[in-house]
Amino acid sequence: MFHIHHARLFAAAAALAASSFPAQAQTAAPAVPSATLPPTIVTAAPIAGSLTRPSDEQAAEEARRNPGNVTIVPASDFLERAGATSIRDMLLYTPGVFAEPKWGEDSRLSIRGSGIARNFHLRGVRLFQDGLSVNQADGSGDFQELDPLTFQRVEVLRGANAFALGANTLGGALNFITPTGRTAPGTILRGEGGSFGFARGQVAHGWAQGAHDAWASFSGMTQEGYRDHSAGRAYRLNGNTGWQWADNAETRIFIAYNNIWQQIPGAVTRSQALNNPRAANSANLAANAMRNLESTRLGTITAIRPEEGILVEAGAGFVSRELDHPVAFAPGFYQYIDQRTADISAFGRSTFDRQIFGRENRTIIGVNAAKGRNRSLRFFNNDGRPTTVMTANSIDRATNLDAYLENSLEVLPGFAFIAGASAGRSWRESDDGFLSNGDDSGKGDWGWVNPRFGVLWQAAEGAQVFGNLSWSTEPPTLFDLIPQAKDVQGFSKLDAQRSATLEIGTRGRRGDIAWEVAAYHSRLRDEIQCQTVGFSQCVALNLDRSIHQGIEAGADWVFLRDIGTKGDGLSFRPAYTFSDFRFDDDATFKNNELPGVPRHLFRAEMRYRHPSGAWFGPTTDWVPQAYYVDNANTQKTDSYVLFGLRAGWDFENGLSAFLEARNLADTRYIASASVAATATPNSALYEPGTGRSVFAGLQYRF
């Protein structure tokens, strides 16, 4: 699936990146001591950011300006792990995020209950890479294009706390930030291997000189997979180059290329998931189900500081995707999906930091625009190859426009009041070119005005209290609107999903303990739920009223120091998520629980670190209570507890070694599940979790 025009782009990008690098690599700067245990050296040392790329410290400072729960996840959280391939691996200890693997690098992602009934791919969370949209223009998306090896940090902006990115979704946004030649100078060579035929390698290089810098990474991965029919291969290029064309101005250009081949084992029944977890769904085997993707992303951001206290930013991105996707819509009804998509996006944002009557004041104003086109064809599928018999042909389009304004005023010393609003409109359209089974053409548009109010109190040194009341509107995606089930026709007439969320919480660091705790209560109208109506078939519907509420709590505590030698320490890192999602006096389902996510999710790691660079410790994942998979609350998953072990050694010469053993007891469990209106014991809704596995890796930075 390596097409000629993409091959030329790939070669040109590689040549451009190579031409930016001198023969001599720079040596990475020494690590800056942290407030807790000494950090690993698998990531670049903290270096000052630039106008287009704030440093990790600057990003953390921005997070502290937000009157809601925002987490900055440093790359060390996942780069010191061998075999970290998915969004789950990147956000494992981020409370409030439910991300569980399905197959390959795909995951089931939900933040505060977003998209819990989206059985395929993603809705309800906006994904950004370097501030530019990864989602398609209609808001849908997936995770295959995200390479954990190429990120410097992940910014987790839950719910309306992604306001300044223009994300009007219940789940908020995830912003994946790549390094630059200034933040990651030098060369990285990395290799990993492990269970189920897993092997991965990476070479990356960063360079900076004068007003110019460049960084690029190439990685390749192959795996056979834990389950039958779950093998995959992926090759990825990511890079950027920056030019400080004035003391107060900078432009950065980004490029990314992905070539991914992935088999899909499919969901199975509960009994099969717990008794024969490695087996694939028989229909997926017969259809030779796969998801093969080739994509190219180009983008640019320019930032100008015309005077102190004013920052003006503008950017644009383009993504081209080619998807070849053999699937099983029903036993004996096998389809081959052939899609070609093109999405463009643009944004403008201005930030004004000024004093009003001697009080600090910040105003942010911005606009976002996105437009996408998808040519979608379907054919009968013969063992993973398209036949000449067409079953669907459409041109689908999506457009979004929105603007936002937010102001934060320090009304009292250490106490700020925040007020803002966003307004926008979305358009969706599908032109059906295959009319022998009826005309499914249609179009719709949805508009919104959403206010937001918040408070932020610096209660003590290193401790903040925050709260906000925010509204959001989430238009349906094209996937929601276009018939996905075999016997369903017509462009759906869905309302936009609306919610109002009240959130309170606290965060901070005092001495050897850091924490983040938040509680939220959301009331939703017209929640969009994709209900399974048959084998691998989904129909999107609006619910009437529903409630999402929960608690997000995380900490990082160094509770012992100088145990056996000066400079060593023992730390404990727990993350707890409580999710209470339910119908609100529904005519059919009363006050039943909404299916799809566990009520309680607890993860923790204990780690001993020696000043020589050696570290090790146990890990645990605990879901103490099974959760429902259907609206009728008749069928459940199963509770489980998993134990693991991690270890590593960071040597002074730039070499790092790391090892991870997962699911040591080889527990059989259900990692995630699709949802249905009413399930039976024979419903194929369950994704088995991975059995016992071991991964190891080496990284050398010079």
What is each PLM-predicted segment?
Residues 248-258, 292-435, 456-458, 516:
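Face-selective signature of the C-terminal outer-membrane beta-barrel domain
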Residues 473, 570, 622-627, 649-702:
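C-terminal beta-signal and adjacent terminal beta-strands/loops
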Residues 60-63, 87-90, 109-110, 125-129, ...:
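N-terminal periplasmic accessory domains that precede
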Residues 350, 412, 416-417, 425-426, ...:
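Gram-negative outer-membrane beta-barrel transporters
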Residues 303-305, 311-327, 458, 464-470, ...:
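Membrane-embedded beta-barrel scaffold of Gram-negative outer-membrane proteins
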Residues 354, 359-371, 394-523, 607, ...:
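Structural signature of Gram-negative outer-membrane beta-barrels, strongest in the C-terminal barrel
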Residues 132-158:
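Short acidic/polar hinge/loop motifs at secondary-structure boundaries
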